[in-house]
């Protein structure tokens, strides 16, 4: 199973937001961190399915080290929580076909 790094933004008085640096437009939210991460797993699966159905490729995940070296992502990695969200390999195989 492949895992994507997700940025979990938790601010007092706001919903918890989750986004994926490697997957533009793939976002989720929830009232709690656990709920937001659960929703992120669902969002990732739906996002990947839409990409496959649209004939588009799914970008490979970067490692945490690679993301830390990205000047656009590094500040968010330092400020927010990070989670690894799984994507079934079957979706990646379909994307490659």
What does each of the following model-derived ranges do?
Residues 4-6, 33:
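Short, charged low-complexity linear motifs
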Residues 21, 26, 51:
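Short glycine- and Lys/Arg-enriched binding-loop motifs that mark or flank ligand-binding interfaces
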Residues 4, 16, 26-28:
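Structural detector for hydrophobic anchor residues on beta-strands
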Residues 1-4, 39-97:
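Short, charged, surface-exposed hinge/linker loops at domain edges
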Residues 24-35:
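A short, exposed loop/beta-hairpin motif centered on an aromatic-Gly-Thr core
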Residues 8-23:
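Short aromatic-glycine-(Arg/Gly/Cys) micro-motifs in beta-strand/loop hairpins
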Residues 18, 27, 82-85:
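Hydrophobic aliphatic residue packing
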């Amino acid at each position: 199973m492949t895992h994507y790094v997700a940025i979990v933004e938790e601010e007092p008085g706001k919903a918890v937001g989750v986004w994926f640096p490697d997957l533009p437009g793939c976002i989720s939210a929830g009232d709690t961190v656990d709920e937001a991460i659960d929703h992120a797993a669902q969002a990732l699966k739906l996002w990947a399915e839409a990409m496959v159905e649209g004939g588009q490729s799914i970008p490979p995940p970067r490692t945490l080290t690679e993301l830390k070296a990205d000047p656009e992502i590094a500040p968010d990695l330092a400020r927010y929580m990070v989670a690894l969200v799984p994507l079934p390999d079957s979706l990646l195989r379909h994307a490659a076909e």
